Swiss-Prot record:
This is Zinc finger protein 618. The lineage of its organism: Eukaryota, Metazoa, Chordata, Craniata, Vertebrata. Regulates UHRF2 function as a specific 5-hydroxymethylcytosine (5hmC) reader by regulating its chromatin localization. The keyword Secreted does not apply. Interacts with UHRF2.
Amino acid sequence: MSQPDGAAAPQVDGASAPGRKSAVNRERLKRSQKSSKVEGPEPVPAEASLSAEQGTMTEVKVKTEVPDDYIQEVIWQGEAKEEKAGGKDSTGDVPAEICVVIGGVRNQQTLDGKAPEGSPHGGSVRSRYSGTWIFDQALKYASGSYECGICGKKYKYYNCFQTHVRAHRDTEATSGEGVSQSNNFRYTCDICGKKYKYYSCFQEHRDLHAVDVFSVEGAPENRADPFDQGVVATDEVKEEPPEPFQKIGPKTGNYTCEFCGKQYKYYTPYQEHVALHAPISTAPGWEPPEDPDTGSECSHPEVTPSPRFVAAKTQSNQSGKKAPASVVRCTSLLHRTPPATQTQTFRAPNSGSPASKAAAAENTFSRRVESKAQNHFEETNSSSQNSSEPYTCGACGIQFQFYSNLLEHMQSHAADNENNITSNQSRSPPAAVEEKWKPQAQRNSANNTTTSGLTPNSVIPEKERQNIAERLLRVMCADLGALSVVSGKEFLKLAQTLVDSGARYGAFSVTEILGNFNTLALKHLPRMYNQVKVKVTCALGSNACLGIGVTCHSQSVGPDSCYILTAYQAEGNHIKSYVLGVKGADIRDSGDLVHHWVQNVLSEFVMSEIRTVYVTDCRVSTSAFSKAGMCLRCSACALNSVVQSVLSKRTLQARSMHEVIELLNVCEDLAGSTGLAKETFGSLEETSPPPCWNSVTDSLLLVHERYEQICEFYSRAKKMNLIQSLNKHLLSNLAAILTPVKQAVIELSNESQPTLQLVLPTYVRLEKLFTAKANDAGTVSKLCHLFLEALKENFKVHPAHKVAMILDPQQKLRPVPPYQHEEIISKVCELINEVKESWAEEADFEPAAKKARSATGEHPAAQEEDRLGKNEVYDYLQEPLFQATPDLFQYWSCVTQKHTKLAKLAFWLLAVPAVGARSGCVNMCEQALLIKRRRLLSPEDMNKLMFLKSNML
């Protein structure tokens, strides 16, 4: 080493005795550096106590040359040590090395600019961060604390003292002439270029980048110490090729994914989204590409750090000269556990070699940094949970109330990405394989065409066709339900996939290669379930409306029954439904148990804060669901209850209506006789009623509709006794009452159009019908009085029904009498006020003080908002009625700018169905109960299979 001549440390003004003592220590340090050059490279132990906090970290002794402007700081550190030791002098000879404490990211960049001596930029960083004389004057270490010499404040930890002194230095710097205010942002990140004014903020930002990357250049003995990390200055970092995932866009905070084009406002969700494009597993023979600029590569791609962290590592050669820093960036995407072979390589018997020690140290440090990042992520989520903040998915932006649901959702993204990668790989077989079988197939095709005279589309011989047909017949005979499956497109796709696989990889035995098909399907059932679950979650979470409709309906098949949970929302001009879960019903299930099951399933797909309207049947108690949102009753179930309560044998016997009981029995016998099924005579309506409609009513209406055909049939069969016992007059009167009821049920169960706005008009229409028929004499009058009582008791009209009726521009307030107009308008305004907070765009962050100030002026603003909402409702009601039946969603899409609040309310309420049961519920319940009785699948697998059946196709 060469000693600089004429170097003098700055002296402190007004310090006589301490100045002489500092000069003696400085001369002693210079002599020790000269002697270290003669004595040899063996290090001499030295003690350095910077602070109580740094003392717990790993100490690495680095031989280096110390510039003169650094000597003064070493002197006051030695003085503090001597003062703490009670004036006891140190050893006779000053050590030739300087102990640099490394072991945390906070030690890589200090306030005064010192960097580890292995870093080639230590001098430049020092020259940038060394300020005025304030730092040298400020420190007074006494009685275990650091005292500021400027203002007298005391600090226990050295880092806190540094931050305080920096404030004095910044104040002096900004008070001078020619100093720009932008110089306060002096801490610049060398990874992404962001600038920070305060060191603590800069340090937290560096924690997101910092991770040790072990360089593989050179021999093991030439490798640098794995803990020798330096901070690379911004102006001295070599230009590198852009990373595969980088910030694209202006400086306004727009981050665009270059794979799928999604845009993010914040960098962290963008990073998490980009990580999802990474392959889940790395091929065994994969090696990272070499960097053309730095020539460095990642030694172990399976143990590459997370893309959240990027590290800069410096190296020194054996000659002691400072080599240029090489910034090593690992291009792998996800942190993966190394395979067993690599784990054994890391634990080689030759653990005493420099290479094994360096590798072990590197792995230890990487694990520590990864663990620190994971703990930081968990603490962040824990704090957000304590503050009642939702967990947000960085890939799609969906929010979850519980952290476990977020983890499961992220695994679904990973499974979806894995499936896309594997499917793409399977669709593109190697070219060599195609060259092997394609010419052969063409040759066989040509031979068959020329020899047997078959067309190119009939290359299979007739004998093979007969064999295939025989196998198909065996499958059909084994299960009659396979008749529609074999001719379906999914079975054809399966057969084509088997043929293509055999063509690619040669003829093979399906049983030997694929094994049991049921086992194969169940093995991949969770992966397929997660893929479809991600799509359903994204569809429900990205809903432009601020609410959904949820139906929980029980369907009975014989003695068994099950619950089906379905979510509805408006997507464009259509209503989209998603079956979320299927659960077997039990007699012991109460309303609270069903409610808990519904809430648990919904928490996996949507946030609990989302506005929800529940539609349940008569078996589910509405009291439990009313706590979570508005709860309505299925309109078909309500009308069915009306009919059953009136036409039940117990009620008719109590009212002495024996002729009605006899009529119902005769109609049921006629409809159930051999050859007189419903399919024989047809039905009056093309659209079938929902599965929760009463079958007794259908029998009566069927006999009335096809009375002439039934009489002709029985006259030929010479069985006129049943026809003679039929009361034709009473049958006609009952049909006149029940036909409008069934027609209303069919209208309310329409699956392609909004139906909630029809509930109140249906109630008014049926009430008028029963009132008019009640004035007649005889049995019909008694029945109509019973129907009126049952209608008021079972067919409830809720405020949501009234609001939905107003949202129909063809009806508005026309179906109801004028004295109810003000009541319905007030209900509309109340519902708008309840959900208007959800419509407002929330700010990213609002301080508590600002919220407190805004609370004082909330009352006048709320009154103004209520007035505007009521004026909007009156303006809408003054518009003329539509003469033709409009498409409601298309109408509200056109008037969104004119009636903003009503339009948002319409896209929520009009998507809620009036009837909870659908036409496909019966088939789904039959299959679910069949699986349950035969014990083919577990309840969990059965639920996943039903979910796939409903949402995948």
